[in-house]
């Protein structure tokens, strides 16, 4: 018997939310982060939503404190502030291009990918094998002024992934992109029930984002600390690097004969999945899971990092619209989705207070009102 979802897509009350209009960074209201998220639900589902929503703020505050503390020294550096204003100007012309691949260039070199058997505590398929993949990334920043600084992160220049592969003929591959700080393969394996997808016949690739896991700097305080803490210009390059290395892994999968590939990701990984869906012509599906879509609006809803938004306005000499524009280059809202309509799906948590439902709602509009699944839980 098929179990019906507890929350129907139409149960989200969006009467007070804006209709998406481009350029979104100018048309989105300044109080978007504070607009309510309401659902029609029966008493049991309402209790589940409210209970899970009450849990998120505590964890969110802890994560925001960590991220804010990591970013604060760079924000307070006066000489770095003047340099940052000049650096972000380099990226403005790319926003005017029709093709996002003008900035997110396809790799021009191949990768020599090494396969290493995974440790025994990782998932071990009975009818296949599991390997760690790695290669020396040939990525170079688009902005020459950032080349030395970015490439100075030597550990970040090795790309990592874990690959589960069935014996016999190549299978369709599910690409999984983790969230901010949530990079451990074992965590995503269990939390996202990835062995279930493997047992349905998918090969699985778990991709490690830049500055996470073994790509983390030796002295970084936590995994992912350097992802957002080095200024908005370098953040653009970080997303370019994330896409570049993932594309090299995808090229490898094509060479191995995989008949199809699709991507899913959670939170920051959902954001990256949305970006990838605007760049790749042959993704069979894209399923962002509790995605964010505007980094600056998300920051405004996270205490205490929301206190740094006014500092960022001062650093970059702009307002909220200007900060959104600086980060729009990598937002899924900026570019048309290339995945066929039938292959698009968004998963949102009704009680999510990390990436609130309004973010999923915006992406749902942008993706032509594609399939949308709400679950009565949090991030």
Task: Show where each model-derived region lies.
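N-terminal targeting or regulatory segments adjacent to alpha/beta-hydrolase or S9 domains
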Residues: 1-145
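Proline/glycine-enriched tight loop/beta-turn segments at coil->beta junctions
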Residues: 153-159, 165-174, 199, 339
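Cap/lid segment of the alpha/beta-hydrolase catalytic domain
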Residues: 176-241
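Gly/Ala-rich beta-loop-alpha elbow adjacent to hydrolase catalytic centers
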Residues: 264-273
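Hydrolase active-site cap/lid region
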Residues: 272-319, 374
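Short beta-strand/loop motif that positions the catalytic acidic residue
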Residues: 339-340, 345-348, 352
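Conserved alpha/beta-hydrolase "acid-adjacent" motif
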Residues: 353-359
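Histidine-bearing beta->alpha loop at or near hydrolase active sites
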Residues: 361, 369-379
């Amino acid at each position: 018997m098929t179990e019906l979802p507890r929350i129907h897509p139409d149960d989200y009350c969006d009467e007070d939310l804006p209709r998406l209009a481009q350029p979104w960074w100018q048309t989105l209201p300044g109080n978007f982060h504070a607009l309510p998220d309401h659902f029609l639900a029966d008493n049991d589902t309402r209790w589940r939503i409210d209970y899970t929503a009450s849990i998120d703020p505590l964890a969110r505050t802890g994560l925001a404190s960590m991220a804010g503390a990591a970013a604060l020294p760079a924000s307070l550096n006066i000489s770095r502030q003047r340099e940052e204003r000049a650096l972000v100007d380099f990226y403005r012309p790319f926003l005017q291009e029709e093709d996002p691949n003008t900035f997110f260039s396809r790799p021009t070199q191949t990768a020599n990918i090494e396969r290493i058997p995974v440790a025994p505590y990782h998932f071990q398929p009975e009818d296949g094998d599991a390997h760690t993949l790695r290669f020396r990334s040939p990525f170079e920043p688009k902005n020459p002024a950032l080349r030395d600084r970015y490439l100075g992160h030597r550990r970040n220049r090795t790309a990592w992934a874990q690959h589960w592969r069935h014996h016999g003929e190549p299978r369709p591959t599910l690409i999984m992109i983790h969230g901010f700080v949530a990079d451990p393969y074992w965590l995503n394996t269990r939390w996202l029930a990835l062995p279930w997808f493997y047992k349905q016949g998918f090969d699985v690739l778990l991709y490690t984002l830049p500055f996470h896991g073994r790509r983390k700097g030796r002295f970084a305080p936590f995994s992912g600390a350097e992802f957002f803490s080095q200024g908005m210009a370098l953040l653009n390059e970080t997303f370019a690097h994330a896409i570049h290395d993932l594309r090299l892994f995808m090229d490898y999968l094509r060479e191995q004969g995989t008949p199809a590939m699709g991507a899913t990701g959670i939170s920051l990984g959902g954001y990256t999945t949305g970006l990838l869906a605007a760049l790749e012509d042959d993704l069979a599906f894209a399923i962002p899971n509790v995605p964010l879509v505007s980094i600056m609006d998300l920051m405004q809803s996270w205490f205490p990092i929301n206190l740094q938004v006014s500092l960022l306005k001062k650093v970059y000499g702009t307002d909220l619209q200007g900060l959104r524009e600086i980060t729009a280059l990598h937002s899924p809202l900026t570019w048309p989705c290339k995945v066929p309509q039938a292959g698009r799906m968004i998963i949102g948590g009704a009680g999510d207070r990390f990436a609130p439902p309004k973010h999923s709602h915006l992406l749902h509009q942008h993706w032509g009102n594609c399939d949308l699944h709400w679950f009565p839980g949090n991030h």
